Amino acid sequence: MNIGRGDQRRTILLVDSDPHCRAALRLALEGAGFSVGEAANDEEGERTALRVKPDAILAELLMDTPHGRGTVSERLKADGSIIPCYIVSTASEALMGSVGLHELGISGVFLKPIDTAIVIQTLKGRLGMGDSGA
């Protein structure tokens, strides 16, 4: 895991049950100058987020959550977290109209297949990073 702030890189936490999706996003994000942490499920994602304090989280939407505890973003928001959390999903645009994303603590949605250039541009804009660093 490439997590840390010694080089002042912004840290992104990937929470996705698909190791191939995590690997593809990791390569793109690290290539753009981000540090990347990974978690395979929401519970692990919550623990990792509390430990490493990422600058943003990309989390799979349709993931089993233990005991109906809600998504990682909902649980972190309930604990007072202000970490921007983006959903990664195969769901259609209908989802976005039917769910109050901000009420769930969601900053935005990226649809699979992921366009990594859009993800990187969005994260850099949200985190105040210029294009000059990557």
Regions found by a protein language model. Name each.
Residues 52-63:
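Active-site beta3 strand of CheY-like receiver
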Residues 17, 87-93, 113:
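Conserved active-site segment of CheY-like receiver
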